[in-house]
Amino acid sequence: MRVPLIISGPGIKGGSESGTPVSGSDLLPTIMDLAGNKTIALTEVDGGSFASILFNKDNNQVERSVDGIFFHVPYKNGIALKRPHSAIRKGDYKLIKFQDDKSTLLFNLVKDKKEQLNLAT
């Protein structure tokens, strides 16, 4: 869930960084917002615009129609967890549930960036 996103453009300060989590579902609302198009209601898409974060370092919130960032991997893959799972990131925490054995992992991502201490056990 921690994949860098690099954005460059007019009005965006070079070398600036933000630790605010965003997801692929935030890209459409952000692009629409940057283009000045307000026709997509927040309730019509899962993501939210992070345009204000690009121009205002004091802002660190993405307003979404749902609270948290959701991920679902319904198949086995060779990346990361390698098992079908679903995850939600909300605030400082990430909760993962595996489909095969119903096991659960819970991590505080601020205190445990490497996700070593499972708080669900």
Model-flagged regions — what are they?
Residues 1-12, 23:
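Histidine-centered active-site microenvironments of extracellular/periplasmic hydrolases
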Residues 119-121:
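Short, intrinsically disordered, charge-balanced linker/junction segments flanking boundaries
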Residues 13, 20, 25-28, 32-109:
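C-terminal cap/loop subdomain of S1 sulfatases and analogous C-terminal strand-loop tails that border
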Residues 112:
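Intrinsically disordered, low-complexity polar regions and short flexible loop motifs
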